[in-house]
Amino acid sequence: MRILGLDPGLARVGYGVLEVDEQRRNQPEMVDCGIISTDAGRGEGERMVEIARDLRQLLRLHRPDLAAVEKFFFYRSSNTIAVVQARGVLIMTLARFQIPTVEYPPMQIKLALAGSGHADKGEVQDAVMRELRLNERPKPDDAADALAVGLTAWFQR
């Protein structure tokens, strides 16, 4: 099974691709991780088009069986609406490719990986390293967060 984890954002969308041999019940292995970045000098609409285009390329390249997206919870921020809109672009693109999608709020991701819904970013990143048997934390943070979302999907299956 191939799982694509996504951490939504307007400037940067983190992604992480995991591979799991379900018959052997192996631990997930990281196939790829990184970010989709958009040009801050462009309008929001153009940036959404960039996100959709780059996600389509990732979907064609990695052919995930399942996508997991961080469910945004609201807080007061000047970019809240833009992030929610970018998340909508991700969900729409996944639907167009008919990829089953699950969503998890940050607290559930932290609980699944670090054992506490109030874990800090470092604790979650350490758990990602441990679960994927990595020697160092994935960079940038958005990619590490996306791997955490993907791992949560594997743990919650």
Curated annotation (Swiss-Prot):
Its main location: cytoplasm. It catalyses: Endonucleolytic cleavage at a junction such as a reciprocal single-stranded crossover between two homologous DNA duplexes (Holliday junction). It comes from Synechococcus sp. (strain RCC307). Belongs to the RuvC family. Keywords: Cytoplasm, DNA damage, DNA recombination, DNA repair, DNA-binding, Endonuclease, Hydrolase, Magnesium, Metal-binding, Nuclease. It is found in: Cytoplasm. This is Crossover junction endodeoxyribonuclease RuvC. CDD domains: RuvC. One of its GO terms (biological process) is DNA repair. Pfam families: RuvC (PF02075). The RuvA-RuvB-RuvC complex processes Holliday junction (HJ) DNA during genetic recombination and DNA repair. Endonuclease that resolves HJ intermediates. Cleaves cruciform DNA by making single-stranded nicks across the HJ at symmetrical positions within the homologous arms, yielding a 5'-phosphate and a 3'-hydroxyl group; requires a central core of homology in the junction. The consensus cleavage sequence is 5'-(A/T)TT(C/G)-3'. Cleavage occurs on the 3'-side of the TT dinucleotide at the point of strand exchange.
